[in-house]
Swiss-Prot record:
Catalytic residues (positions): D76, E135
Stated name of the protein: Succinyl-diaminopimelate desuccinylase
Gene for this chain: dapE
Pfam families attached to this UniProt entry: M20_dimer, Peptidase_M20
Reactions catalysed, as given in the entry: N-succinyl-(2S,6S)-2,6-diaminopimelate + H2O = (2S,6S)-2,6-diaminopimelate + succinate
EC number(s) given by UniProt: 3.5.1.18
Length: 376
């Protein structure tokens, strides 16, 4: 008989691992041991090289056949920074909260699901856990590597629950059924350096860049739709490496980000922006990096089942939302329908990050009901 780990105790053990991306510091082995004890076959994959690696990923599988429910999460954390009231990697329970880096994002969620899967071992179909050590970093060697391995093994989940902290005020108030896409762009306008007293012998790139920025700021990308707010362009940096007051600079740069909804594809937005820039300065250089496409999981079996489990345990009917930043769900949506649900996110990435002990236990009960609903 499997003795299920206590979710809070397991979360504390994981928090004690200084798994700042891309370091693991033993977190994967702790999870692997717990999952093996619960009857899972565990695969540990190491990918990549410094500076973004090596990264350790975990794939645990139990059972076989349809349906296949996957849980996805990450064990890496962001740097702790300064100003904590206690050591961020010495887990502490204070006033009913588990305090430590990763308590919210997202070691407690991973621990809650492992505990739930350890309690409910006799099920039909397939249950898997896909845990990466590279979500907070570039994600180059994380979830994409897991998906590559699954494809090589011809393993395809039917549904995926991502345990990111989605709750806002109370556990269960918000479920993410989609995410906006994100593209970063860099614009360079080249001029001709010269003395400010002789502008006829120079070409100032700053006014040209200013016109480009003004045009982009006035660009209405869309008005949003049923699931998404309007797409948004933000200028995040303007640079001109010139400290002299009597020199017209030779180069001006801008950096911007577009968070876009499912009405767009990243490449189409990049192409449209390049055309707008070229209309003002055909010689301007534009570079782009698309970090994720927008996606939405329509209401159906996955959203309904998770919402029902939340309502049963909390009395709350969650709101479906696509707000916030990107997550690894942007990769997993290529495999199957994806929904994200987890703890209250108020302190994630903050000093004295903390999760309610009762919320961790309740999350584990919700996870168990989700497993039962799909695989019972």
């Amino acid at each position: 008989m499997t003795i299920a780990p206590d979710p809070v105790d397991l979360a504390a053990r994981l928090i004690a691992c200084k798994s700042v991306t891309p370091s693991d510091d033993g977190a994967m082995n702790i999870m692997a041991d717990a999952l093996k004890s619960a009857g899972f076959t565990v695969h540990l994959l190491t990918k990549g090289q410094a500076p973004d690696g090596p990264v350790t990923n975990l794939i645990a599988i139990r059972g076989e056949g349809y349906p296949h429910l996957a849980y996805a999460g990450h064990s890496d954390v962001v740097p702790a920074g300064q100003g904590w009231s206690s050591d961020p990697f010495t887990p502490t329970i204070k006033d009913g909260y588990l305090v430590g880096r990763g308590a919210v994002d997202m070691k407690s969620s991973v621990a809650a699901f492992i505990a739930a899967a350890s309690r409910y071992t006799e099920h039909k179909g397939t249950l898997s856990l896909l845990i990466t050590g590279d979500e907070e970093g570039p994600a180059t060697f994380g979830t994409p590597a897991i998906i590559e391995w699954l494809n090589e093994q011809s393993i395809k989940p039917d549904y995926c629950l991502v345990g990111e902290p989605t709750s806002v005020e109370r556990l269960g108030d918000t479920v993410k059924n989609g995410r906006r896409g994100s593209v970063n762009m860099w614009i360079e306008v080249e001029g001709i350096q010269g003395h400010v007293a002789y502008p006829d012998r120079a070409c100032n790139p700053i006014p040209v860049l200013a016109r480009i920025i003004s045009d982009l700021e006035s660009w209405v990308l869309d008005k949003g739709d049923q699931w998404f707010q309007p797409s948004n362009l933000e200028v995040t940096s303007i640079e001109c490496d010139n400290k002299a007051t009597n020199v017209i600079p030779a180069l001006a740069k801008a950096q911007l980000n577009i968070r876009f909804n499912a009405l767009h594809k990243g490449a189409e937005l990049v192409d449209s922006l390049k055309k707008r820039v070229a209309a003002i300065d055909p010689k301007a250089r534009v570079k782009a990096a698309i970090s994720g496409e927008a996606f939405v999981t329509e209401e159906g079996v996955l959203t309904d089942t998770i919402s029902a489990a939340i309502a049963k345990n909390t009395g709350i009917t969650p709101s479906l939302s696509t707000s916030g930043g990107t997550s690894d769900a942007r990769f997993l949506t290529k495999l199957c329908p994806v929904v994200e649900f987890g703890l209250v996110n108020a302190t994630m990435h903050k000093v004295d990050e903390k999760a309610s002990v009762e919320d961790i236990r309740q999350l584990s009960r919700i996870d168990e009901d989700i497993i039962k609903s799909f695989l019972g």
